[in-house]
From Swiss-Prot:
<keyword id="KW-0472">Membrane</keyword>
<dbReference type="GO" id="GO:0005739">
    <property type="term" value="C:mitochondrion"/>
</dbReference>
<keyword id="KW-1133">Transmembrane helix</keyword>
<dbReference type="InterPro" id="IPR038814">
    <property type="entry name" value="AIM11"/>
</dbReference>
<protein>
    <recommendedName>
        <fullName>Altered inheritance of mitochondria protein 11</fullName>
    </recommendedName>
</protein>
<dbReference type="GO" id="GO:0016020">
    <property type="term" value="C:membrane"/>
</dbReference>
<feature type="transmembrane region" description="Helical">
    <location>
        <begin position="129"/>
        <end position="151"/>
    </location>
</feature>
<comment type="similarity">
    <text>Belongs to the AIM11 family.</text>
</comment>
<keyword id="KW-0812">Transmembrane</keyword>
<feature type="transmembrane region" description="Helical">
    <location>
        <begin position="79"/>
        <end position="101"/>
    </location>
</feature>
């Protein structure tokens, strides 16, 4: 990302702050008549010289390995899912709010405030089911995608593996593999292997 920057700074300060910036043109300007700016300032006009990726410590995309690119794409997909459900939740909440506001009864002058306005049971029930279902689905999706993004989970297999690892199932499985086998179990296993080997 390269942009054009033209600004006023005191002489020598920009070279100390950003030594990697290539200055294409340096002009001396004596601003003696300006009450806001001090005299003897340097006008730096930089074209194709300021790189934000270097400023923020990002590497050149050509130098990044394939694994890092795949990891970045994976995290970007998780983030996109979370923010997509967040926007959907916000939209559904605004729709539900507008639906509730529309049903509000505001009496005019010389009207009773205890008289129920005309309404339809079918329409109210349908709108209530729609609003509650949309809010429940989008909020659940936002919460689940946020948790999956936090724990870096992108598939069902990864979820089952990390859940098994968190509950201690992986360690128990390794302990069971280290235990010596029973003689009867070993005989049954050998007979099954021999039967399958003959066929």
């Amino acid at each position: 990302m390269r942009i054009l920057l033209i600004f006023f700074v005191p002489s020598g300060i920009l070279d100390q702050l950003f030594p990697r910036i290539s200055i294409l043109s340096t002009l001396r300007v004596n601003l003696t008549n300006s009450p806001l700016l001090t005299p003897n300032l340097t006008l730096y006009s930089m074209v194709n010289g300021f790189d934000f990726s270097k400023m923020f410590g990002r590497k050149d995309p050509e130098l990044v390995s394939k694994e890092v690119k795949q990891y970045n794409e994976r995290r970007f997909k998780q983030m996109a899912l979370f923010y997509g459900f967040t926007v959907a939740t916000f939209i559904c909440s605004k729709i539900a709010y507008r639906g509730v506001i529309k049903r509000r009864y505001v009496p005019n002058y010389y009207q009773h405030n205890h008289v129920a306005p005309p309404f339809s049971f079918y329409r109210d029930a349908l709108s209530a089911v729609f609003h509650s279902t949309s809010l429940a689905i989008t909020s659940l999706g936002m919460a689940s995608t946020g948790v999956l993004w936090y724990y870096d989970i992108s598939s069902v297999a990864e979820f089952s593996f990390k859940l098994k690892q968190a509950l201690g199932g992986h360690d128990k499985e390794q302990e069971l593999k280290k235990l010596p086998e029973d003689e009867t179990v070993q005989e049954i296993q050998n007979s099954i292997n021999s039967y399958l080997g003959d066929r």
